[in-house]
Design a protein with these regions (language model features):
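PLD/PLD-like phosphodiesterase catalytic module centered on the HKD motif
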Residues: 1-44, 48-176
């Protein structure tokens, strides 16, 4: 009788450097599985237009459902989504748009005001861990659980949240 050791091993957030779209996608999915499993209370997703993120991926949305659903049992959860171009998100990721509607009470979507989209950081942040795409075009970057690194990035993201963005990407669009 064989046993699957991986089934008993909880996922761990990836650390170090990543290189390429495939690895970036894998690390985003894995980090969100860890967020769901460990009950991370706050997430910040920041990107100019989320092109190159696996936001339309069924597996990722199921993981986001698990993370969001944990708010019932494990305390309040919050996800801040910072984006310069939500119209691109709306067109490219209809499944994510539907997910956003279901969990609107946990999401704070903010429209970034910026002249150059390249100035917007590409970051997935939590209090315990974060990942930054330093080279968006080639999907290269770093993931770290260093406390100081996470604190510094929370301060940078706080600046974007409070001074350089406004509420955006409503869950429903009301019309006449």
């Amino acid at each position: 009788m064989s046993t699957d050791l991986n089934a008993a091993t909880p996922p761990q957030a990836p650390l170090g450097r990543f290189d390429g779209r495939v690895q970036f996608d894998e690390w985003v999915r894995l980090s969100l599985r860890v967020a769901a499993a460990e009950g991370w209370r706050e997430l910040v997703l920041c990107e100019a237009d989320f092109h190159g993120w696996p936001l339309g991926d069924r597996e990722m949305l199921e993981t986001l459902n698990q993370w969001a659903g944990g708010s019932r049992a494990g305390g309040a959860r919050k996800c801040i989504v910072l984006c310069a171009n939500f119209e691109s998100v709306r067109l490219r990721f209809p499944r994510f748009v539907q997910w956003r509607t279901r969990w609107e009470h946990l999401l704070d979507c903010r429209q970034i005001s910026v002249r150059n989209a390249a100035d917007v950081p590409s970051v997935l942040w939590s209090q315990r861990w974060m990942m930054q795409r330093v080279d968006v075009e080639r999907s290269r970057g770093i993931a770290s659980d260093d406390v100081q690194f996470c604190v510094e990035w929370r301060e940078k993201l706080g600046e974007w949240i409070t001074s350089r963005s406004r509420p955006g990407f409503p869950a429903t669009i009301l019309g006449l």
